[in-house]
Amino acid sequence: MTNIRKSHPLLKIINNSFIDLPAPSNISSWWNFGSLLGICLALQILTGIFLAMHYTSDTATAFNSVTHICRDVNYGWVLRYLHANGASMFFICLYLHVGRGLYYGSYMYKETWNMGVILLFAVMATAFMGYVLPWGQMSFWGATVITNLLSAIPYIGTDLVEWIWGGFSVDKATLT
């Protein structure tokens, strides 16, 4: 009698991907951070979609929408905390994934490493935009501090900061 995980069409795919995965026996736990990144990213997307359903860009009602999510939405507080802590876990896994690549010398594969660096910058830019764009529900101080780092660029830094802010200071919601 054959095992159902090897004969059923859907279970066979899962079996070949996870259980009978052709991987070397000396693989360490450092190699699972890519999978954890995928899980964290899926969690971020799902919780972000559900939180966006209650989004309001008006600075006067932004705090009320957050309290509405936490108090009135079923398990809204769980969504909010999963989204916040999921972002932290995502970046922890990301940095450990990069650290594993450094430790095992993956930087020797130049094309692969350069693509990873591009993806790292894209992820950081996306996270920054996700933090800065909904002005009404984020920290003006955080946006000011993060974007002020650009002022350290010689000659064009201050002009670049003013261009990103659209003026001399961060103000009002940008998403409507």
Swiss-Prot record:
Q: Which GO terms describe its cellular component?
A: mitochondrial inner membrane
Which parts of the chain span the membrane according to its record? 33-53, 77-98, 113-133
Q: Which Pfam families match?
A: Cytochrome_B (PF00033)
Q: Which GO terms describe its biological process?
A: mitochondrial electron transport, ubiquinol to cytochrome c
The cofactor remark states: Binds 2 heme b groups non-covalently.
Bilayer topology annotation: Multi-pass membrane protein
Q: In Gene Ontology terms, what is one molecular function of this protein?
A: metal ion binding
InterPro entries, A to Z: Cyt_b/b6_N, Cytb/b6-like_sf, Cytochrome_b_N_euk/bac, Di-haem_cyt_TM
Indicate which residues the UniProt annotation says bind heme b b566. Answer: H97
Query: Where in or outside the cell?
Result: Mitochondrion inner membrane
Which cofactor does this sequence's record say it needs? heme b
Name the residues that bind heme b b562: H83
Keyword entries, A-Z: Electron transport, Heme, Iron, Membrane, Metal-binding, Mitochondrion, Mitochondrion inner membrane, Respiratory chain, Transmembrane, Transmembrane helix, Transport, Ubiquinone
Family under the similarity heading: Belongs to the cytochrome b family.
Please, what other remarks does the record include?
Heme 1 (or BL or b562) is low-potential and absorbs at about 562 nm, and heme 2 (or BH or b566) is high-potential and absorbs at about 566 nm.
Question: Assembly state and interactors?
Answer: The cytochrome bc1 complex contains 11 subunits: 3 respiratory subunits (MT-CYB, CYC1 and UQCRFS1), 2 core proteins (UQCRC1 and UQCRC2) and 6 low-molecular weight proteins (UQCRH/QCR6, UQCRB/QCR7, UQCRQ/QCR8, UQCR10/QCR9, UQCR11/QCR10 and a cleavage product of UQCRFS1). This cytochrome bc1 complex then forms a dimer.
- Sum up the protein's function in the record's words: Component of the ubiquinol-cytochrome c reductase complex (complex III or cytochrome b-c1 complex) that is part of the mitochondrial respiratory chain. The b-c1 complex mediates electron transfer from ubiquinol to cytochrome c. Contributes to the generation of a proton gradient across the mitochondrial membrane that is then used for ATP synthesis.
Under what name is this protein listed?
Cytochrome b
- Whose protein is this, by species? Lasionycteris noctivagans
